[in-house]
Amino acid sequence: MDTRVTMVISKYGIRIKKKINAETKPHPSSNDVDEEIFNFLKRCGYNFGVKFPCSIIKDLYSMLEGDNDIKVVTVTREEEGIGVSAGAYLAGKRPFMLIQSSGLGNSINAIASLLKTYKIPILILASYRGHYNEKIPAQIPLGKALPGMLNAMEIPFLVLEKSLEPLETFCVKMFSSSEPHVVLLSPELYENE
């Protein structure tokens, strides 16, 4: 079986593109991707989540709300979630955020001025809107600009388009560097071949 992985690496971000042949199993369904992320969060000891509503990762929200080991808080603005996550970390929790990439754009200053300045390692999982088969035109400008914005702010990020495999290694790097890391979850993850 021939599987090719292409990595495009900038100073702060890694984009993974995995090309698969016909012998490779199809992309997991939406629920499979969300379940893999849920299992990753549990396995890595995350125990506090901040979420902002998003239709793409709604199945993951349901899984988290039904779990007794992870406390999940819904916020009304993503910047609010940055502050809540920072407070949870300082209180001894291992927090993560689930948001849309548009909200990530709104939160860049809070991430840089709070999380980066005080070396708070928050995992930010964002559904990556505006770059792949986007049906809402208003999402496209930020979707195109987001990787450049993250690079400019020196915020490490990873774009997952076909597989969740690089996620664990990326998070190990986050904790060893004590700084926030962003994972952009492409809609491609949620498609079936």
Please report, for each region that a protein language model flagged, where it lies by residue.
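Thiamine diphosphate
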Residues: 4-193
